[in-house]
């Protein structure tokens, strides 16, 4: 027995020696930021990316799925370009948490600085954030960000070999889309947002005009607002058939070859429907409202992002209706969208019940925070792990229609921590905080949970509940909102939504079906085994129906107008055929 103890002791000593050796990083990684006569000092998030291949640049190989490569991040604060940056050997990484955990082998390495700008907020806070530069808050594509060319590096048992990188490449500006006969583009300075952010802030919109808009100056039009992620231009509309020479591209998401051709076919089909003599004449708009936190604002007022709800509803939309002959009354405005856009459509309808006449919310982001994906922020103590005396099980964040899991809440949040602290990653959980949370003493959003441990803050959770939990708000205020929202709420979701968003829809449906005086008189529907983002089409597969948002709700909208338009409303000027 003694000899066994001796062998065990030797084994443990050897194991400890190996651990100590592997934890030591002797590498020197230096990053040079070339001088710029217009900006000597710089702030931002310095990202270092390792990838096994260079078929596409490493900066484009980071994601939350199984194909992701490795990324590390550190802050750069008031840095003088004359000085090299020694990359922090203790910088947090994803999915490998530290440099000493990198597997041995050869990698392609690239560095990128996500540049921050300084904002003097009307709240009295000074914050440093990445300004959107026309790309929709994408750190690896944002104009003005600087990066290095990829280099090949060897990682040994003691970590990466020493190497230098120069951020001598710059992402160029993005060309603005040009007006066409059908689609117009505007930029609108918001006085409300400019006052909050301490600088000029612009909202954008892409406007699809109805057939023969110029030939009918007497016509005024209802307005359809398509909410969703940042649109570079008006999508899903083309005036010509699919390109004959277009090479088929495979869609991993839908397991379909030639999906790019299908997209062009659907866009052309919509153009033909839009011109059909019997198709109602509407204005459709897609809004650009990126913030320093995300590719859009969630279209509501918030402590951290400012009054985007009021800016869109009371500034932008009346301006568009004036310029493009909208009817300009609440009964003539309709909201729709999926995912983020689904939440926005419902939230805006709830927050501004008299200004809109119906919402069609597909696969909305969590509309009940007791089902914040798979987390109950009111009852759960931790967002990353299920509660158990002995077992450790992470909470999933993404599945396919068969339930196969590809990511967890902890992993998603750790990637965000690498991309940016203080809710500055530009990713999903951080924008929810930027939208729903109160402002912290340092001017950044308060955390709903500790980003490292997952421990939930009940005070912040209660703030979310009172201000942005849509199911709770409807239940709390139904005596005030019920009559204003009757017949206006339509919600759709697949019962195998990839992000478990159907769970919140179930609880919302339970409340809505319990309403009386008045009964909500709307619609909640589910797609069997349908993934994100099913939108209510029971006849076609998801990969088709997601391309038909701009026409699929029109029959329901027309029915709504028929039963709700006030006496004397203009129901004829926009119903011309030619």
Task: Identify the meaning behind each predicted range.
Residues 1-5:
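Positively charged n-region of N-terminal signal peptides that target proteins for export
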């Amino acid at each position: 027995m003694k000899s066994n103890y001796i062998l065990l002791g030797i084994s443990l000593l050897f194991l400890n020696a190996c651990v100590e050796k592997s934890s030591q990083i002797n590498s020197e990684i230096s990053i040079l930021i070339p001088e710029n006569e217009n900006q000597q000092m710089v702030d931002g998030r310095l990202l270092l990316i390792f990838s096994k291949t260079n078929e596409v640049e490493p900066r484009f190989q980071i994601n939350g799925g199984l194909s992701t490569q490795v990324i590390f991040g550190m802050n750069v604060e008031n840095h003088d370009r004359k000085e090299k940056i020694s990359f922090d050997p203790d910088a947090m990484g994803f999915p490998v948490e530290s440099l000493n955990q990198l597997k041995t082998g050869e990698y392609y390495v690239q560095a990128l600085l996500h540049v921050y700008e300084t904002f003097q907020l009307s709240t009295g806070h000074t914050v440093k954030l990445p300004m959107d530069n026309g790309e929709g808050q994408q750190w690896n594509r944002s104009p003005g960000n600087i990066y290095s060319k990829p280099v090949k590096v060897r990682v040994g048992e003691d970590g990466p070999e020493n190497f230098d990188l120069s951020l001598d490449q710059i992402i160029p500006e993005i060309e603005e889309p040009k007006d066409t006969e059908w689609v117009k583009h505007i930029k609108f300075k918001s006085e409300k947002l400019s006052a909050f952010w301490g600088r000029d802030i612009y909202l954008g919109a892409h406007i699809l005009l109805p057939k023969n808009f110029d030939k009918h100056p007497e016509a005024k039009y209802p307005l359809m607002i398509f909410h969703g992620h940042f649109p570079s231009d008006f999508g899903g509309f083309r005036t010509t058939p699919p390109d004959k020479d277009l090479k088929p591209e495979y869609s991993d998401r839908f397991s379909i070859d030639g999906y790019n051709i299908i997209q062009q076919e659907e866009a052309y089909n919509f153009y033909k429907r839009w011109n059909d003599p019997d198709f109602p004449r509407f204005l459709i708009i897609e809004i650009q409202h990126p913030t320093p936190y995300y590719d859009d604002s969630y279209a509501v007022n918030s402590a951290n992002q400012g009054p985007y709800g009021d800016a869109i509803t009371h500034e932008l939309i009346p301006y568009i209706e004036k310029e493009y002959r909208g009817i300009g009354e609440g009964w003539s405005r309709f909201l729709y969208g999926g995912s983020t856009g689904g939440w926005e459509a419902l939230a805006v309808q709830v927050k501004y019940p008299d200004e809109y006449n119906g919402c069609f919310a597909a696969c909305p982001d969590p509309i009940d925070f007791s089902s914040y994906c798979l987390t109950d922020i009111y009852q759960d103590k931790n967002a990353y792990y299920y509660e158990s005396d002995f077992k450790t099980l992470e909470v999933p964040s993404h599945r396919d229609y068969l339930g196969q899991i590809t990511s967890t809440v902890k992993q998603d949040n750790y990637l965000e921590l690498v991309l940016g602290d203080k809710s500055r990653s530009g990713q999903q959980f951080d924008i929810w905080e930027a939208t729903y949370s109160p402002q912290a003493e340092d001017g950044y959003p308060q955390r709903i949970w500790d980003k490292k441990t997952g421990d939930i803050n009940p005070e912040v959770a209660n703030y979310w509940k009172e201000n942005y939990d849509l199911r709770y708000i409807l239940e709390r205020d139904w005596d005030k909102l019920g009559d204003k929202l009757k017949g206006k709420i339509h919600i759709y979701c697949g019962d195998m939504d990839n992000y478990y968003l159907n769970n919140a829809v179930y609880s919302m449906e339970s409340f809505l079906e319990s309403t009386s005086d008045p009964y909500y008189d709307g619609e909640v529907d589910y797609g069997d085994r349908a993934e994100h983002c099913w939108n209510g089409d029971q006849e076609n597969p998801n990969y088709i129906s997601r391309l038909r948002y701009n026409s699929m709700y029109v029959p329901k909208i027309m029915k709504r107008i028929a039963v709700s338009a006030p006496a004397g409303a203009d129901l004829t000027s926009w119903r011309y055929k030619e």
